């Protein structure tokens, strides 16, 4: 039985994990942590966990990593809004611990990333723009998923990522991200490839949070026998594909 520590247990994602965990017979929630707890409580939290799923806030990440290193506790990080300093901490810790980070753990969003990478190879002379839509209370903008998608495409094509274009014209070597906030929208991401004569749009819409938490729990299980490294959801899919071949 895998003991999973849940960081961010009182948030929307945490509550959904608690509601879905019984569907998985080989793991259980062994410890919980939320933003009202004392940060030093992370010591026992990590001690009582084989792996931690973190859907909390960037502010606790450094202490969470420190205690995870102390107790050799694996990490699945789904918290968004991380800054470059946080990724440096993850990269350093991943030399000692297996860590999986993803801004979006749903199968559909990661398939969208894969398809976008393939499409931009074929449609080499098309302009690329990303539009993301979320509920009115989402704190970070653009979304972590939009940044993930943009970075995947930018690496493939050597583009610059632009968040706020303002009143200047679009340059040739850029990919733009635009954000909408309103209503109770869970998550919509659209990648538009715009040519002179046609437009192709790739779209993923999450109807609820179930796909995110199922991906997170599966990631925690997958991470159990892995060596120290910083993994992504693509590593899980690549590993599964290799086993099938």
UniProtKB/Swiss-Prot annotation:
- This protein's name: 4-hydroxy-tetrahydrodipicolinate reductase
Which HAMAP family does this one have? DapB (MF_00102)
The kind of enzyme this is, by top-level EC class, is oxidoreductase
What is the E.C. number?
1.17.1.8
Q: Which GO terms describe its biological process?
A: diaminopimelate biosynthetic process; lysine biosynthetic process via diaminopimelate
Major place of residence: cytoplasm
Organism classification: Bacteria, Pseudomonadati, Pseudomonadota, Alphaproteobacteria, Rickettsiales
Q: Which reaction does it catalyse?
A: (S)-2,3,4,5-tetrahydrodipicolinate + NAD(+) + H2O = (2S,4S)-4-hydroxy-2,3,4,5-tetrahydrodipicolinate + NADH + H(+); (S)-2,3,4,5-tetrahydrodipicolinate + NADP(+) + H2O = (2S,4S)-4-hydroxy-2,3,4,5-tetrahydrodipicolinate + NADPH + H(+)
Sample GO molecular function, one term? NAD binding
What species does this protein belong to? Answer: Rickettsia akari (strain Hartford)
Query: Which InterPro entries does its entry note?
Result: DapB_C, DapB_N, DapB_N_CS, DHDPR_bac, NAD(P)-bd_dom_sf
UniProt-annotated binding residues for NAD(+): 8-13, 78-80, 102-105
User: Which residues participate directly in catalysis?
Assistant: 134 (proton donor/acceptor), 138 (proton donor)
């Amino acid at each position: 039985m895998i003991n999973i520590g849940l960081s961010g247990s009182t948030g929307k994602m945490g509550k959904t994990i608690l509601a879905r965990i019984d569907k998985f017979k080989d793991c259980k929630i062994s410890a919980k942590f939320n933003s009202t707890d004392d940060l030093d409580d992370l010591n026992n939290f990590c001690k009582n966990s084989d792996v931690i799923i973190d859907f909390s806030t960037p502010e606790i990440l450094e202490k969470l990593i420190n205690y995870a290193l102390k107790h050799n506790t694996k990490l699945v990080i789904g918290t968004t809004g991380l800054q470059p300093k946080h990724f440096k901490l993850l990269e350093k810790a991943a030399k000692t611990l297996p860590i999986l980070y993803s801004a979006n753990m749903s199968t559909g969003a990661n398939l969208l990333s894969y398809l976008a990478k393939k499409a931009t190879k074929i449609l080499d002379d098309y302009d690329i723009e990303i539009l993301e839509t979320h509920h009115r209370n989402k704190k970070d903008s653009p979304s972590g998923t939009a940044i993930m998608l943009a970075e995947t495409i930018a690496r493939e094509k050597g583009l610059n990522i632009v968040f706020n274009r303002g009143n200047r014209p679009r340059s040739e070597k850029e990919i733009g991200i635009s954000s909408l906030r309103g209503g109770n929208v869970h998550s919509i991401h659209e990648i538009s490839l715009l040519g002179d004569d046609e437009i192709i749009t790739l779209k993923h819409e999450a109807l609820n949070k179930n796909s995110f938490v199922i991906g997170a729990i599966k990631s925690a299980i997958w991470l159990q026998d892995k060596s120290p490294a910083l993994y992504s959801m693509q590593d899980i899919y690549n590993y599964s594909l290799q086993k099938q071949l």
